[in-house]
C-alpha cells in the first residue's frame, strides 16, 4: 500500500473505531490527518501521536490526501467525502482500512453481539504478558495501555470485528472469535435474523485452511451455524462439552475465581483469578484463554495477565466513592452497555460485586430503532434495579419513532409497577439528578453508548 498511498485522511477521526486505525498508521510512518465535529480527549491524544486534527468538516481538510477513510456514521453529503469523490481520491470504509492493516500481520478478529471490546482487551493483555507484543485496535480504551490502539513488534494484530454494518466481512484473520449472536443492528440485515446468522457463517468461512474458529459453545445461535463452518473449531463456555470450560466459579469482591478445564490435548487445568466481575466476563476470559493457548502463550502468562487485568474504559469502570452533600457517599460505576442482554449481565455483575446494596441505574437508551425492537426487553431489565434515572433517547442520527422514545419507556415502566423512573429530558441534568436520587451506601451505575459517557466524570467532580 505504501508505494501508492502516503497521506491518509480520516473523516470522524475521533470515533472509537477510527482513532485506533489512525494511530497505528501514524506509527507506520504514514502522514495521517483527520477531522471531527468537536475536539476530545481522543483527538488530543492523536495530535500527540503526530496526527493533524481539524475541528469541523470542510473540503480543504483533505488537501494532499491519497485516500480518505470513513465510517458508516459519515454521510454521503459530508463535504470532505464530496470533495474526495470529485477529485477521484479513493474513499475507503474503515473496515477495509483495518483489513489492509491485518494483511501486514496475522489477524485475530473478535466478533459477536456482546463482549467484543472486553474479549479483545483480554486477548491483547494475555499476548502482551506472554511476550508476543501484539498490535491492537480496540473499540474502548485499554486501561493498562492508556489507549485503544498500539503498533506492536509481534506477528499478531488483535482487533474487533464489527457486525453492525456487516463490515467484518472485509477481514481475513487467521483466528476468529465469536462470543455470541443476538438480535441487534437488525436494520443492516433487513430485520431477518437468519441473514444475520449467515453473515457470521461468512465471517468464519473467511478463515484460511489453517485458521481456527474460537466460539462460545453455550450460545444456541452459534451452535446452530457450526454445521455450515468447515473449519477447525474450538469451543468455550460453562458446559462440560466445551473444549475450554469453567468450573468452581466464585464471585469474590469484584473478581471472579474459577478453574479453566482444557479439553484440547492440554490436560492441565488453570486456576484463574479474573480481575473484573460478572459471569459474562468469565466467558470472555475463556475465549481469551483459548486464543492464548492456540498461539502457545505460557500458562503462567495467562494466569498473571487475567489476575492483573486493569479493564477497559467504560466497561464496568469504577470511579470510586462520591461524597453526598448531606453526608455519606455512594460508589460510582460506568458502563457502555446499551442492549438489554448486556445490561442484564452487567447489572448481575454489579449485584455480585456489591451484594446487599441499593442499585441505582442512570440509563440513556441508544437509538430509536433499538428501543423499538427491544422495547419489552428494556422494560424487563430496567425493572430489576432499585432506582432508575432514565434519559431521553440518544438518537445517533436516527429520526424519532413514535412510541419508541424515552417517555414511552418511562410510561411502560410505571405501568409495570416495579420501578418508578425519574425521567431526565436533557442529559445535562443527569449529574444533578443522580446526586438528588442517590443515598449513602448506594451503587450508582451509569449505562449507555451515547452522551451519558460524559456524566460519570461530572458526577465525580461534585464536592
Swiss-Prot record:
Subcellular localization, as worded in the UniProt entry: Cytoplasm
Top EC class for this record: ligase
Protein name from the UniProt record: UDP-N-acetylmuramate--L-alanine ligase
Lineage: Bacteria, Pseudomonadati, Pseudomonadota, Betaproteobacteria, Rhodocyclales
Primary location: cytoplasm
Domain of life: Bacteria
Function description: Cell wall formation.
Keyword Cell inner membrane assigned: no
Amino acid at each position: 500500500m505504501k508505494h501508492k498511498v502516503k497521506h491518509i485522511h480520516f473523516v470522524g477521526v475521533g470515533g472509537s473505531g477510527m482513532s485506533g486505525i489512525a494511530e497505528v498508521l501514524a506509527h507506520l510512518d504514514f502522514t495521517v490527518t483527520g477531522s471531527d465535529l468537536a475536539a476530545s480527549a481522543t483527538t488530543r491524544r492523536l495530535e500527540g501521536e503526530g496526527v493533524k486534527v481539524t475541528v469541523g468538516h470542510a473540503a480543504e481538510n483533505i488537501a494532499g490526501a491519497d485516500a480518505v477513510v470513513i465510517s458508516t456514521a459519515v454521510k454521503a453529503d459530508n463535504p470532505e467525502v464530496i470533495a474526495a469523490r470529485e477529485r477521484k481520491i479513493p474513499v475507503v470504509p474503515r473496515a477495509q482500512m483495518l483489513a489492509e492493516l491485518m494483511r501486514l500481520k496475522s489477524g485475530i478478529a473478535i466478533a459477536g453481539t456482546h463482549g467484543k471490546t472486553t474479549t479483545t482487551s483480554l486477548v491483547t493483555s494475555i499476548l502482551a504478558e506472554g511476550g508476543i507484543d501484539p498490535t491492537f485496535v480496540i473499540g474502548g480504551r485499554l486501561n493498562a495501555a492508556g489507549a485503544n490502539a498500539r503498533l506492536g513488534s509481534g506477528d499478531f494484530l488483535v482487533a474487533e470485528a464489527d457486525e453492525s454494518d456487516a463490515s467484518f466481512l472485509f477481514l481475513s484473520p487467521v483466528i476468529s472469535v465469536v462470543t455470541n449472536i443476538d438480535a441487534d443492528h437488525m436494520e443492516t440485515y433487513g430485520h431477518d435474523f437468519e441473514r444475520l446468522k449467515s453473515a457470521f457463517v461468512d465471517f468464519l468461512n473467511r478463515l484460511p485452511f489453517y485458521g481456527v474458529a474460537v466460539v462460545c459453545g453455550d450460545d444456541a445461535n452459534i451452535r446452530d451455524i457450526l454445521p455450515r463452518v468447515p473449519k477447525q473449531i474450538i469451543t468455550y463456555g460453562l458446559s462440560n462439552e466445551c473444549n475450554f470450560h469453567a468450573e468452581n466459579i466464585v464471585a469474590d469482591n469484584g473478581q471472579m475465581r474459577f478453574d479453566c478445564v482444557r479439553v484440547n490435548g492440554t490436560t492441565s487445568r488453570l486456576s484463574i483469578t479474573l480481575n473484573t466481575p460478572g459471569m459474562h466476563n468469565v466467558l470472555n476470559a475463556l475465549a481469551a484463554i483459548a486464543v492464548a493457548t492456540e498461539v502457545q502463550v505460557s500458562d503462567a502468562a495467562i494466569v498473571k495477565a487475567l489476575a492483573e487485568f486493569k479493564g477497559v474504559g467504560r466497561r464496568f469502570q469504577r470511579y470510586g466513592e462520591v461524597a453526598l452533600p448531606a453526608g455519606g457517599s455512594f460508589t460510582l460505576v460506568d458502563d457502555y452497555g446499551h442492549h438489554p442482554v448486556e445490561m442484564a449481565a452487567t447489572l448481575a455483575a454489579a449485584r455480585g460485586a456489591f451484594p446487599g446494596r441499593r442499585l441505582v441505574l442512570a440509563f440513556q437508551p441508544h437509538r430509536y430503532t433499538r428501543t423499538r425492537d427491544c422495547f419489552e426487553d428494556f422494560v424487563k431489565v430496567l425493572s430489576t434495579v432499585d432506582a432508575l434515572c432514565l434519559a431521553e433517547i440518544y438518537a445517533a442520527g436516527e429520526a424519532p419513532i413514535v412510541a419508541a422514545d424515552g417517555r414511552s419507556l418511562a410510561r411502560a415502566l410505571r405501568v409495570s409497577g416495579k420501578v418508578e423512573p425519574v425521567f431526565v429530558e436533557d442529559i445535562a441534568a443527569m449529574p444533578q439528578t443522580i446526586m438528588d436520587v442517590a443515598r449513602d451506601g448506594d451503587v450508582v451505575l451509569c449505562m449507555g453508548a451515547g452522551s451519558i459517557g460524559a456524566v460519570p466524570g461530572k458526577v465525580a467532580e461534585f464536592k
